[in-house]
Amino acid sequence: MKSFIVVLCCLFAITYGQTDLPAIRRNARFQRNLALVALHNQIFGAEGVENGLAKTQEEKVCILNVKEAALEEGNIVLDETVGKIIPEVERLSTSGTEAEIKAFLDKTDYPAYKKSAMNEFKQKIMTWIPAVQGKMAACRK
């Protein structure tokens, strides 16, 4: 059920239109946070299952270490996909000139960008999460 709600929110974030920089800024942050929640659901869900099956403290520590590494790697994936546009939007929002902002808005098709970024994120995560689950399962002897 949680996954269904996250998917609905992702679709809403993708289809909601943006015409100005503040709207793009809000939506880019929202989309990144939404992707972060989806990532955490996958990683913490896998951790919960494996911790339930772990028999020793050593196995649980190993699972925790895999989870921490996965969270770090997941944040890198986020920054390379759905979060890629955020630094430029933040810079323009705080110190961009009118000409820079206009040029950015003219050259950026944000709805198409965010749809492709979210698809890229989902594709990377769906191929990466099974490997994380496998590493966690390998912690149990």
UniProtKB/Swiss-Prot annotation:
Cysteines joined through disulfide linkages: 62-139
Stretch forming the signal peptide: 1-17
Compartments in which it is found: Secreted
Tissue: Expressed by the venom gland (posterior main gland) (at protein level).
Cellular component annotations (GO), alphabetically ordered: extracellular region
Keywords, comma-separated and alphabetical: Disulfide bond, Secreted, Signal
Family affiliation: Belongs to the insect vpf1 family.
UniProt name for this protein: Venom protein family 1 protein 1
Origin species: Platymeris rhadamanthus
